[in-house]
Amino acid sequence: MRRDFVYNNNAMFNPLTTHYSSDMNWALNNHQEEEEEPRRIEISDSESLENLKSSDFYQLGGGGALNSSEKPRKIDFWRSGLMGFAKMQQQQQLQHSVAVKMNNNNNNDLMGNKKGSTFIQEHRALLPKALILWIIIVGFISSGIYQWMDDANKIRREEVLVSMCDQRARMLQDQFSVSVNHVHALAILVSTFHYHKNPSAIDQETFAEYTARTAFERPLLSGVAYAEKVVNFEREMFERQHNWVIKTMDRGEPSPVRDEYAPVIFSQDSVSYLESLDMMSGEEDRENILRARETGKAVLTSPFRLLETHHLGVVLTFPVYKSSLPENPTVEERIAATAGYLGGAFDVESLVENLLGQLAGNQAIVVHVYDITNASDPLVMYGNQDEEADRSLSHESKLDFGDPFRKHKMICRYHQKAPIPLNVLTTVPLFFAIGFLVGYILYGAAMHIVKVEDDFHEMQELKVRAEAADVAKSQFLATVSHEIRTPMNGILGMLAMLLDTELSSTQRDYAQTAQVCGKALIALINEVLDRAKIEAGKLELESVPFDIRSILDDVLSLFSEESRNKSIELAVFVSDKVPEIVKGDSGRFRQIIINLVGNSVKFTEKGHIFVKVHLAEQSKDESEPKNALNGGVSEEMIVVSKQSSYNTLSGYEAADGRNSWDSFKHLVSEEQSLSEFDISSNVRLMVSIEDTGIGIPLVAQGRVFMPFMQADSSTSRNYGGTGIGLSISKCLVELMRGQINFISRPHIGSTFWFTAVLEKCDKCSAINHMKKPNVEHLPSTFKGMKAIVVDAKPVRAAVTRYHMKRLGINVDVVTSLKTAVVAAAAFERNGSPLPTKPQLDMILVEKDSWISTEDNDSEIRLLNSRTNGNVHHKSPKLALFATNITNSEFDRAKSAGFADTVIMKPLRASMIGACLQQVLELRKTRQQHPEGSSPATLKSLLTGKKILVVDDNIVNRRVAAGALKKFGAEVVCAESGQVALGLLQIPHTFDACFMDIQMPQMDGFEATRQIRMMEKETKEKTNLEWHLPILAMTADVIHATYEECLKSGMDGYVSKPFEEENLYKSVAKSFKPNPISPSS
């Protein structure tokens, strides 16, 4: 048997992505003649793949893929990797088609066998029936489209009705309100000129003339009249004075004896018949009048027929007071001050008719107005109930006529039912005709499909081979990751155990250097495997609560030492609008930030690196960069500015001007305008990372996000890196439903930004029931303290204020030490000797502001002398902010009066708090956390626990046992799944089991399933609940996923090599913290 590898020099094969070019496919199938004869390498079963030359693998990888200086190293790597993988495949007897395992004769036979009858050829007789079925389906779809368009037309028709009805209701209310205001003004006029003038300036003739001449202001009123309040004992004198008798409204007879009357004394000529009639003689009228004077507001009657027009109308009544009322009068004060009542009659029917006559489309709808004060018996105010209308559709609009006691509404309907729209009549037949034609076209195309069926089979074969190659690639990556990470786990574990022993400084330095290198190698492997998982579509994001600000502070701490060594400003700012806790994949979010900040630190030698986080909608118009590389800047336009200082974080020019103070101050000023009614469950963040580094050449900007690509060949030599971080970051951002882009100017710097959609997480209860979020608990001892920050750079000062604000410190920013002296002196003058009053607690000075001039030391001494002279308060402490500081500068700062502690950058809230506790000589108190949120240490979780470690590798067993014993656990080791089953026979005394997944004979999944089966059988027999927490241990980062572990019955997952944080997250779910003695 022979295995033939057929390839040509133009074929492209990438062991990581397994992409075949068209040349390779045709060469594999020997289907077409090439200009150059493909080279055949024949290997028999007895031969080894090791006999392949490096040049053969170089040609397999593509002749032009490698530079001459890089060929030997990269060729040997892939050669050894592929040969090693082939040897493993031979040993495991796995049959995967990584390359074509057939010769030319077999290829020709296969191509000949594929030429047979196809599905369409075999079922040609069914094609007419299929066409008829197609026409029926098109008919059903056409009817569905008709129904959909008809429903849409009904919705639009309803929207128009709603708009027209609401418009009429608003206009009716507005016109009614105008008339009510005029009646109110007339009531005030009567009160002023009839009761406040002596003698009265109003009589019947004056009132009638005035109301007649101002009737144009009250077009909706048929008339107005004024009735005076008359009590019973004043009735006789009142009747003699007016020379008429008070009469009832219904019959015109003398009014019977009552406690109080309201006879009309003034009236408009149109309602002169109301003179002498008692407005309180009717029961409902009496109630309305009493309600008006008690509330001081206008009241309405129920609808009734007006005497002259016989139209439906209502009477509006206003109280008239004879004296001025207090600001908030009581009901008794209103009644006592009442002098009379001004009433106006509204002709509702005429009002609505006039309104509808002014509007377009009046004939299209039917309008009814109701009084629904009594909901069970609504009263018709306007409209004919028997009028013909489309009763299938109606809209109701509420009416407010100013009387809260009475309720009104307007109901609108169309006069006629909706006709079938023209677009429906044309679209549906057109769609049916098109569908019918499509059916005939498909029927004719069926014969053509028969002719291309052979090509389809050919492509199907290529697809099968590509899938087989993808399986081989996945297994290759899984095996390589396991085989590399397993010994690396042993190396890093042993180094960690070595560092726990007594070592000399030189030995410790060697061990720590080896540990750092090992972790760097693991990080590189993880990046390559992440890229592979992304290409395979197997990378998924988790959703857990986490604290963005804590994540960013942690990232800054990773690069703090390097930024100090380079004397560059490294800072972060998070908008107050960004929620404190969000839900998402904290690890992947952190990975993106680390990649971007790491690149900035790597390529920046001076200036600053500024990380800013805010809501993408917060400044959408001005903050979102243009969706183009470099913001559309051409190479001819890039000129390095000669300006010496810029309003940026460090004063150096940046590629993107949005983080300068002119733009940044608008973002800061909007911090307090957080909307409370945003009900969206998601939050869209924008994160920008600005640096003043070397920038990216224009010619390289198009390939920045391509994997394994860098600006040029010198980048890797000078700065290191693989060029894979940005491509992974781009994929992760897209998984977070965001986008990433950048603006870069050579020799100026770069600004990368990305957006990410995360979930809001406002309830602490949701956090407690999930994986513990990465939340930083800051000290609360600084709340209410006051500080002055001296910094001439406004952006940097705003960042400092942000971190101080997180600690609860109120900050005032000044630009110079002279201003600080003035501010401290003003504070001293305005201060209070009472200890409970606020005082100035600290003055924090930026190093740049201190060393900028020689006179600043004298200003510091003056500041100390002024503040120390206040006997009522402790003098504020002076502290210095610095990115780095020399010994001479430190000695000078101490002699000038600064505290011994210098707050080193990059600033983080926790670090500032720790330094200020030293500066202010505060006693460090244990943080008080909400119940259940205080993080337990691994020692408190594992002390006294008996744990079984199952692993076939003796080094891994020693590493795992050493790591667990370090935290007080009692460890027993087993070398296989069978031994573990023997030790875990119920009853046993183990508290947990750490189970390796890939073991010979019985893997960890099978061992776990059998353990769970034993526990289930024990429960069925003895009714005793047994559940041993089992945590998976594996170096295989592709197959050993969290879901697979849960499916087999495991409780958690720990990836090799062990990290203390990951170990804690896993065991914290199964164990509760034990109290441990302080000595331990």
UniProtKB/Swiss-Prot annotation:
Binding positions for dihydrozeatin? 285, 307, 317
- Using the record's annotations, give every residue carrying the modification Phosphohistidine: 482
Identification of the protein by name: Histidine kinase 4
What's the impact of mutating residue 306 to A?
Loss of activity
Substituting residue 303 to V results in: Loss of activity
Positions of Mg(2+) binding: 952, 996, 998
Subunit annotation: Homodimer. Interacts with AHP1, AHP2, AHP3, AHP5, AHK3, AMPD, FBR12, WNK5 and At4g15630.
Q: Which organism is it from?
A: Arabidopsis thaliana (Mouse-ear cress)
Consequence recorded when altering residue 307 to A = Loss of activity
EC annotation from Swiss-Prot or TrEMBL: 2.7.13.3, 3.1.3.16
